[in-house]
């Protein structure tokens, strides 16, 4: 009996202890539930929401680039792509292995993806593959459960309707490099492209726009259930150029037979660039996904350098096109008058050196107008000797040669108008012989085709015309395209008149050096000047043999052919330059091209037709 009572007491104590523990546990849980649901309810609700809502930035549509009449030069089309969000998979390598069995990835693609995953925060999507086909997307979706972290998305990619025809002007975009992302972390977004050349680079920030964001509901595996909210961001600004795409096509068609050439057409009145061609060219869309090493090697090995914009970065001796600058320098210095004459026997002796005229028998006695019309080398040897290199250089700069122009394109070169001071700085003792050959555009002088067109426009108008390519930015007419009087060059009307008369005679008068440039439409007359720039020295033996023919030399040893012009002669509207590399003679190779292009410009008359801004609409295209 006593033993039974003792057992009952032990049981009762154990029950009480157990019951007390249970009460304590339930009490603790109750307190915790109160803390979670009441005291900290708002905080935990937010955490729960973040666990099921994924916010992702989206790249904004890049702004369009248009010609002056609204023709699309650079636009956008849809681009379906596969992205990887590293934070949504525990095994990035395993996910990529599975993806590669569905859509094959090359080793260099895997390496790039790995670098980008390491470089960026894990919630930032990384591009796995762009330009997916319908079959690719279907296969990815079917295998979605085995592809944690993979998301099929749609963005945009750049398209260039005129491809090679405007590649050097419009430029191209490419994926941002590490330096780009370091400057702007927002460029890490998949599908973002940055301007790397041409107008795409000049106006890159305006064309980029502002990134948007999308809120997505996702499941535990990170798969999208539905879209909750979307901010499209702000599309890039629209850029309207001064270019007339129709005139550009006409110009390129005229250059089709030349291996390497360039040409520029300007509106004399405001400096608008209406056409700018550089041949050979390239397809700018190849840069969208990054150029392959094989393609880059092909371009690098091509002696014609297709990536070079010859119009702004090709430098050439101007040859006889320099003679208007020499003439104006002589007239403005009052050392030479329009009526002063020089006798040309076909050569010019300076000490022991003999400098030859292009015309073997000489031109006889010529005044300044006749010197320009006949492009007499001896006349300009003597004129250069009398005025000196510094006056020639100063006038060249004044007319836009060998100096920086305000063109809105990256990579423009300044060329060179040498002076005595420049020669001394180079360790070269400037000689009178250097000055003499400079008088016919040989020696150290270097100019670009854009400078030559600007030079022609300045001679035509007597004003400091500056070339430019941007007509409207975000719908606003740019200052350079607004009707305005460019600063006067402060050249005498008499000097300009005699030089212009000489240029008119070159084209329109019997005996001029460019009869092939005469316009067939009698409503207009063109004034111009031929030029041929040697790329190698002609020896005395070759010259004296009488059998030397530069047209029979290998292509790369032939002289460059140049021509500059403006029209109409009596009321200048358009100026141009044509440079045919190794074309041998400006009169034969460049002048006929200039004639046809100028005629087309006058007939189209783009500078007299106003443009009308158009609404921005992204061009769309289905997957391939």
Feature names for model-found ranges:
Residues 1-10, 23-24:
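Secretory targeting signals
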Residues 2-5, 218-230, 268-321, 325-580, ...:
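Beta-lactam-recognizing serine transpeptidase/beta-lactamase-like catalytic domain environment
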Residues 13-17:
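N-terminal export leaders
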Residues 18-30:
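Hydrophobic membrane-insertion alpha-helices, especially the h-region
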Residues 33-55:
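Aromatic-capped interface at the extracytoplasmic side
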Residues 60, 76-81, 275-281:
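Short beta->alpha transition motifs characteristic of CBS
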Residues 84, 88, 94-104, 112-236, ...:
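Small/polar-residue-rich segments within soluble enzyme cores
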Residues 223-261:
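Conserved, well-ordered alpha-helix/loop/beta-strand core segments that scaffold catalytic motifs
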């Amino acid at each position: 009996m006593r033993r039974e009572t003792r057992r009952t007491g032990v049981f009762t104590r154990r029950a009480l202890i157990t019951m007390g523990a249970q009460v304590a546990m339930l009490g603790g849980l109750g307190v915790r539930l109160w803390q979670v649901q009441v005291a900290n309810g708002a905080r935990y609700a937010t955490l729960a929401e973040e666990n099921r809502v994924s916010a992702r930035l989206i790249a904004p549509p890049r702004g369009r680039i248009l010609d002056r009449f609204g023709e699309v030069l650079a636009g956008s089309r849809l681009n379906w792509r596969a992205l990887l969000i590293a934070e949504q998979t525990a095994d990035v390598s395993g996910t990529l292995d599975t993806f590669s069995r569905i859509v094959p990835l090359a080793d260099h693609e895997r390496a790039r993806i790995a670098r980008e995953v390491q470089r960026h925060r894990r919630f930032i999507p990384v591009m796995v593959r762009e330009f997916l086909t319908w079959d690719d997307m279907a296969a990815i979706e079917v295998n979605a459960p085995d592809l944690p972290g993979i998301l099929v998305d749609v963005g945009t990619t750049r398209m260039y309707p005129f491809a090679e025809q405007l590649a050097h002007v419009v430029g191209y975009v490419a994926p941002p490099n590490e330096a780009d992302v370091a400057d702007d972390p927002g460029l890490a977004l998949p599908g973002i492209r940055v301007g790397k050349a041409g107008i795409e680079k000049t106006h890159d920030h305006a064309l980029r726009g502002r990134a948007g964001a999308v809120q997505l509901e996702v499941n535990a595996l990170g798969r999208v259930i539905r879209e909750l909210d979307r901010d499209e961001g702000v599309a890039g600004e629209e850029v309207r150029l001064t270019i007339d795409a129709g005139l550009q096509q006409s110009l390129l068609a005229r250059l089709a037979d030349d291996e390497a050439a360039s040409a520029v057409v300007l509106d004399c009145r405001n400096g608008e660039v209406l056409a700018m061609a550089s041949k050979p060219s390239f397809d700018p869309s190849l840069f969208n996904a990054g150029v392959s090493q094989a393609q880059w090697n092909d371009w690098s090995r091509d002696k014609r350098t297709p990536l070079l914009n010859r119009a702004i970065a090709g430098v050439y001796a101007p040859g006889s096109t320099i003679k208007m600058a020499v003439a104006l320098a002589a007239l403005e210095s009052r050392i030479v008058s329009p009526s002063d004459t020089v006798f040309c026997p076909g050569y010019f002796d300076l000490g022991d050196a003999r400098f030859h005229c292009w015309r073997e028998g000489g031109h006889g006695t010529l005044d300044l107008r006749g010197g320009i019309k006949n492009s007499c080398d001896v006349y300009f040897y003597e004129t250069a000797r009398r005025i000196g290199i510094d006056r020639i250089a100063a006038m060249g700069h004044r007319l836009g040669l060998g100096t920086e122009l305000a063109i809105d394109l990256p990579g423009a070169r300044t060329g060179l108008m040498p002076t005595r001071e420049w020669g001394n700085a180079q360790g070269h003792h400037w000689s009178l012989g250097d000055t003499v050959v400079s008088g016919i555009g040989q020696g150290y002088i270097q100019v670009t085709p854009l400078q030559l067109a600007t030079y022609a426009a300045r001679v035509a108008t007597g004003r400091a015309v500056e070339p430019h390519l941007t007509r409207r930015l975000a719908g606003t007419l740019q200052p350079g395209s607004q009707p305005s009087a460019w600063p006067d060059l402060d050249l005498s009307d008499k000097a300009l008149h005699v030089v212009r008369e000489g240029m008119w005679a070159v084209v329109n008068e019997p005996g001029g050096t460019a009869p092939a440039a005469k316009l067939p439409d009698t409503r207009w007359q063109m004034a111009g000047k031929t030029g041929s720039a040697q790329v190698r020295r002609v020896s005395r033996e070759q010259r004296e043999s009488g059998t030397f023919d530069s047209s029979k030399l290998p292509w790369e040893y032939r002289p460059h052919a140049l021509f500059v012009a403006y029209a109409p002669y009596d009321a200048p509207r358009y100026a141009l330059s044509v440079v045919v590399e190794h074309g041998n003679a400006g009169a034969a190779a460049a002048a006929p091209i200039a004639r046809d292009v100028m005629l087309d410009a006058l007939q189209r008359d783009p500078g007299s037709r106003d443009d009308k801004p158009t609404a921005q609409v992204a061009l769309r295209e289905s997957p391939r």
